[in-house]
């Protein structure tokens, strides 16, 4: 046991000496290199969290670089959430962190999410902030964070147990599905674009009437607004939502000028 203890102490001393030998630059010429100058998130619905995005910050200089402070310039005002090298920029501490070391030839990972507040507009609005890195040398470097936020009418689930009409210039987002009871009619009139979550669809036991118009289809699609690949939006990938299911008790359904896509069934 003693021998093992001394071996472990020797290994610790080696790592300690390596750490002590690392020098950190205060030269204004030594900078971080970022994987992007602007991190563009996809269009999102207000109050609904985005997926997690990320980028790398590299130290390609011959010395270590200390980041004395990293912060969101607008604090908690825009809804961005950031984690830098495992440190969450907590809103209670001013959305900032201090004293992050990036050793020579090393890198750190930055993760970004956004839940934007309601903006009060019918069209998408730009949401942006700057993630500022202040180096020990006094140099300040920034990465712009931006997204387009879209106010929507949100339903977790919608049970139609009486005659109901849906129509809105705003997007309609349904997280868990729509059920039309056997004694009810759901009428959807253009303008109407309905975005369904992955487990959502329309189960019709009563009657479903869709009334689009020439040049103004009623649109039903999945709620993913981002891309599977750079060249392929999720909107063009099947299986993004459950589609429409007509049950035995359903009758007299009419579909006029309906654009239904990216579903599993229809």
Where are these regions (language model features)?
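Sec-dependent signal peptide recognition
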Residues: 2-9
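Short, composition-biased linear "edge" segments at structural boundaries
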Residues: 3, 63-64, 252
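C-terminal motif of bacterial Sec signal peptides marking the signal peptidase cleavage site
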Residues: 14-17
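Beta-strand/loop edge motif enriched in small/polar residues
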Residues: 22-25, 32-43, 48-50, 54-56, ...
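Short acidic/proline- and small/hydrophobic-mixed sequence motifs that coincide with surface turns
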Residues: 50-52, 62-67
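Asparagine-centered strand-capping/turn motif at beta-strand->loop junctions
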Residues: 57-61
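Extracytoplasmic/periplasmic/luminal assembly and interaction segments
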Residues: 69-70, 190
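Short, solvent-exposed loop/linker segments at beta-strand-coil boundaries, enriched for Pro/Gly
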Residues: 71-96
